Structure formats: structure tokens, C-alpha cells
Amino acid sequence: RHSAQSIETQSTSSEELVPSPPSPLPPPRVYKPCFVCQDKSSGYHYGVSACEGCKGFFRRSIQKNMIYTCHRDKNCVINKVTRNRCQYCRLQRCFEVGMSKESVRNDRNKKKKEPIKQECIESLEMTAELDDLTEKIRKAHQETFPSLCQLGKYTTNS
């Protein structure tokens, strides 16, 4: 005896193909709260779970070699609300929870400003030999797939 459940199979007829619904997105990653201020963490930055605010503060402090002073007793409470009140204690807290000074890259902005080297530009120029080879490949493709070339908008030199 067959069970009450029926098994449906997908038809191979192109008329009956229905696009499948998009796959559900994976659940968002949940990180431990920021080790520095307990705000919502955006991931592991410089070795610890950290929020965007503490990540940026630590990076800027290290890249600019900042030296801060505490106007109290060097034991200020650092949390989501108070984290911007004392930069000295916030940076100390970053180090206490394990943020790594060595993980901060100092060369990211420098790379953007470097001029493109002349030898790189020259290597991008197409030689006559490569130009000829490209044209031969294009023509061979056109002869092999003439119906595609009639579409016009999908080819560059039709």
C-alpha cells in the first residue's frame, strides 16, 4: 500500500519550469559583546570581540601614536555610555582586554595614494601580436556561433 504522501518530480518540459524561491539567508553572526565597552560587537577586531566605535578608536590611536591623559584616577568606568569621556582609560581598557597593537596596519592609506608605476601601465598595453590573436579568436567564435553574433547587442564587433 502507498503512503498518503505523494512525491512530486520536476518536469523537464521548459514550459513547466518554475524558478525556485531564493534560498533563505543564513542567520546573522552573533558575537560576544564588545570586550571594551559591552556595546554590540561587529566582529573580532585586533584580536578581540569589539564594536565599530572601539575598533575605530583603537586603530586611530595606534596609527596616530596618540598619548592621552586621564583627568581622574586612571580607573574610569568604560561602557557604551561613558566610553567617550576618557580616552586614556578607554585605550588602557583596549590593551587590558587583549587588543593587539601589532594587528593595526599602518599602510592601508598609503597604498591608495601611491601613483601607478609606469611599468604596470606599459604591461597593460596590447601588443600588435596580442591584438591580432584577439581578432582571430573573435572571428573563429563568430564562425562557430553565427546565431549568437546576429543578436548584435551581445557582441562588441558585429
From Swiss-Prot:
Q: What is its main location?
A: nucleus
The signal peptide, as residue positions, is none
Q: Which domain of life is it from?
A: Eukaryota
- What is a single molecular function from GO for this protein? zinc ion binding
Q: Which biological processes are named by the entry's GO terms?
A: cellular response to corticotropin-releasing hormone stimulus; retinoic acid receptor signaling pathway
Q: What UniProt keywords apply to this chain's record, in alphabetical order?
A: DNA-binding, Metal-binding, Nucleus, Receptor, Transcription, Transcription regulation, Zinc, Zinc-finger
Cellular compartments per GO CC: nucleus; transcription regulator complex
Low complexity composition-biased segments: 1-18
Stretch list, region Disordered: 1-24
| NR LBD domain span | 129-158
Q: Where in the cell is it found?
A: Nucleus
Query: Start and end residues of each NR C4-type zinc finger?
Result: 34-54, 70-94
Entries under SUPFAM superfamilies matching the protein: Glucocorticoid receptor-like (DNA-binding domain)
DNA-binding positions are: 31-106
Disulfide cysteine pairs (residue numbers): none
Q: Which PROSITE patterns match?
A: NR_LBD (PS51843), NUCLEAR_REC_DBD_1 (PS00031), NUCLEAR_REC_DBD_2 (PS51030)
Give the UniProt family note: Belongs to the nuclear hormone receptor family. NR1 subfamily.
**How does it associate, per the subunit comment?**
Heterodimer; with a RXR molecule. Binds DNA preferentially as a RAR/RXR heterodimer.
**Could you give the domain comment from the record?**
Composed of three domains: a modulating N-terminal domain, a DNA-binding domain and a C-terminal ligand-binding domain.
- Biological role stated in the UniProt entry: Receptor for retinoic acid. Retinoic acid receptors bind as heterodimers to their target response elements in response to their ligands, all-trans or 9-cis retinoic acid, and regulate gene expression in various biological processes. The RAR/RXR heterodimers bind to the retinoic acid response elements (RARE) composed of tandem 5'-AGGTCA-3' sites known as DR1-DR5.
The protein's name: Retinoic acid receptor beta
Q: Per the UniProt entry, what species is this protein from, by scientific name?
A: Notophthalmus viridescens (Eastern newt)
High-level lineage = Eukaryota, Metazoa, Chordata, Craniata, Vertebrata
